[in-house]
A protein has these predicted regions:
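A conserved ligand/cofactor-binding region detector
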Residues: 1-178
Length: 178
């Protein structure tokens, strides 16, 4: 890790990230040193939603889960037809509804983002996005981004007693990530 991280601020990268749940969006929004484009919630397609793997594996749960989004979309349409204003209709979204975002972020903030968001302790959805972003960064410039990944890969784990205990496995995984 360089002591001259300010040089990383000169490099910026823009990502279009599709199918980000509203729940995951809060994790992206916590990174203040970025320019993030979020579409109006009034334009969100209420039929689009994330499907967690654990729910997808259980047919009954999957059916009930998808039905909740369908019913919410129906309620939205009923409220809209009843004249409820668009701004209030944003409240008829579920945290699993998805939208597409665009973010521009510099190399220094990306280092912090990857340390936090590619960690096994990160929320699963943002971790998947972070790993996909890291693959693209390594394609663009592997000489710099081969050093990016979770804290345990970059230096040492910062999770203290909450550590996953898999630092060696993570060093191998992120060391071989392409």
């Amino acid at each position: 890790s360089s002591k001259r991280q300010r040089a990383l601020e000169a490099a910026t990268f823009t990502f279009r990230i599709n199918n980000v749940s509203l729940s995951c969006l809060t994790h992206f929004a916590r990174h203040r040193m970025q320019s993030i484009g979020i579409p109006s919630l009034t334009l969100t397609d209420r039929t689009r939603h994330v499907l967690p793997e654990t729910i997808a594996k259980n047919a009954d749960l999957k059916e009930r889960y998808c039905e909740a989004f369908k019913k919410t979309a129906e309620l939205y349409n009923e409220l809209k037809q009843a004249g409820v204003c668009e701004e209030l209709l944003a409240y008829v979204l579920l945290s699993g509804n998805t939208l597409d975002i665009v973010t521009t972020i510099n190399g220094r903030e990306l280092l912090l983002f990857m340390k936090l968001r590619s960690c096994t302790r990160a929320q699963w959805e943002i971790r998947d996005f972070a790993i996909d972003m890291l693959k693209k960064l390594r394609e663009a410039d592997n000489t710099v981004f081969k050093f990016y990944g979770p804290s345990c890969f970059v230096n040492k784990c910062t999770e203290g007693p909450m550590t996953c205990g898999r630092a060696a496995e993570m060093k191998e995984f992120f060391g071989n990530l392409k």
